[in-house]
Amino acid sequence: MKTLNIYHKIAALLSLTFLSLQSFAQQDPQFTQYMYNMSVINPAYATAEEGILNLGGLYRTQWVGLEGAPSTGTFFAHTPINDKIEMGISFTNDNIGDIVNENNIFADFAYVLPVGIETKISFGLKAGVRMFDTNFNGLQLQSGGTNTDIAFNENINRAFPNLGIGAFFFTDNYYLGVSAPNMLSTKHLENENGIKATGVENVHYFFTGGYVFDIDSKLKLKPAFMARSVKGAPLALDITANVLINEKLEAGLGYRLGDAMSALVNFRVTPDLRIGYAYDYTTNNLGDFNSGSHEIFILFDVDLFGFKNGYDRSPRFF
């Protein structure tokens, strides 16, 4: 692996990537194991498991070995209120080299409707706030200190409201989802310091789908995909294929179009607890400068009213 040993070049690159002097489209944080926390990207995600509180956390370190590379952590909670209403909350922190820091706090509301004997569709709303902060103190640009570029003269500390929408069609064996979790575009430095617009965050559109094939009584195949589109950025497409053994051990491979190949594994430690890990091997032009990306998650189900009594109730597999 090659190294970039001049920190100010890395910091300047990352800063300019996220705070270009021209408008640009900033991608939301990405996760290889998105299928285990879909409520973060789609407020309509529904579990249809009354009395069960789903808790989860996920942490990702991207491009390990590249100074100033992003790291992302998220926590989420989701539960049905009754057979038609489900609600959730999520918190996400995205940090880029201790220069750019974004915190998102959202609440989700989903309304579930039956459309057949085994099929349901839910419609969801997401509302919350994005808090965007920068720390340019001590940053060295290629042109010199921060006083050599008006865009970096002052730190930024701003909050932006956000609204999102989504739809989720599902059965026990497959799902399709479409969502726009950030409907309100934001401009982090609009008309400040003589700059027309810096750091534009545009609307992201997500389309997800997956199927659970029963190979035999102990083996299931779970292909899935996620497509993500945002103005000014190329289409992002994740394709994964997992196998589930004895409803406990799950492992799979994935590919992110033009970006990375991934391997993931998770284990159901108890009926209520699952832990997992994923590794991404970078295939784009940054691959020479990092050793890949790592991601861990934990999922925990809380039986609020003792409905499960220690046993599964026709468990869902997504």
Regions found by a protein language model. Name each.
Residues 1-2, 27:
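N-terminal hydrophobic targeting signals that begin at the initiator methionine
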Residues 21-25:
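Sec/Tat signal peptide C-region and signal peptidase I cleavage site
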